[in-house]
From Swiss-Prot:
It is a peripheral membrane protein. Gene3D superfamilies: Phosphatidylinositol 3-kinase Catalytic Subunit, Chain A, domain 1 (3.10.20.90). The keyword Secreted does not apply. Keywords: Autophagy, Isopeptide bond, Membrane, Protein transport, Transport, Ubl conjugation pathway. Pfam families: APG12 (PF04110). Belongs to the ATG12 family. Residues 1-11, 47-57 have a biased composition (Polar residues). InterPro entries: Atg12 (IPR007242), Ubiquitin-like_domsf (IPR029071). This is Ubiquitin-like protein ATG12. Residues 83-97 have a biased composition (Basic and acidic residues).
Length: 210
């Protein structure tokens, strides 16, 4: 009888071992499940937090990303940056000068051209003939002649008016002071010695001056 009880006890021992192993396995599985659930919760929370962060545009982030005060002061006192700023300012001044100077030069050239055009002799000039001494006077005394004509042409014209022959020379003077050369142009003399918009030419048959 005691032997049967011992065998029943021995036979029941493996069952108890299996139960204990199953219990331990179930406890371990529950711990693993809890760990996985906790990890998933943390991952989801982190992902949601990442998705909720606002995305700042690149241009705005550059503007907002300012340097600290000490680094900003270092940049302000950087000699390289100052020299670069000075060079840029010089280039800007040079550019402004280059853009202004041609305009002033053009205006100056225009003024010179206008002044030259005003002093330029007209196409025809007015000549007043004045006799010296007892030389015969002509009427009328005022004539208009082309500015490109020479003094030699004026001498021939006046000789025809006075009906002088070739043997009787005629001497012309400007402002009763000097004898112009025969090839000088009337327009050049008018530009230099005109009086009241007239070129006064004195004449006589003998040498009167010089």
């Amino acid at each position: 009888m005691s032997q049967l009880q011992d065998s029943s006890i021995r036979q029941s021992d493996p069952d108890s071992d299996l139960d204990s192993d199953s219990n331990s396995n179930s406890d371990l599985g529950s711990l693993v499940d809890q760990g996985n659930a906790q990890f998933e919760d943390e991952y989801i929370a982190t992902e949601e937090q990442t998705n909720l962060e606002p995305k700042v545009p690149l241009s705005t982030s550059i503007v907002l990303d300012k340097l600290p005060q000490d680094q900003q002061s270092q940049l302000n006192h950087n000699p390289y940056l100052k020299s670069e700023q000075k060079s840029q300012s010089r280039e800007g001044t040079k550019f402004r000068m280059e853009t202004v100077l041609p305009k002033k030069t053009t205006e100056k050239n225009e003024n010179q051209h206008s002044s030259a055009s005003t002093t330029k002799s007209p196409e025809k000039v007015t000549i007043r003939f004045q006799p010296i001494g007892s030389t015969t006077a002509i009427h009328p005394k005022v004539f208009k002649i082309s500015s490109v004509q020479s003094i030699l042409t004026v001498n021939r014209f006046l000789s025809q008016k006075l009906k002088n022959n070739e043997r009787q020379p005629l001497h012309l003077y400007i402002q009763n002071s000097f004898l112009p050369s025969p090839d000088e142009r009337v327009g050049d003399l008018y530009a230099l010695f005109a009086t009241n918009h007239e070129l006064i030419i004195s004449y006589c048959n003998t040498i009167a001056f010089g």
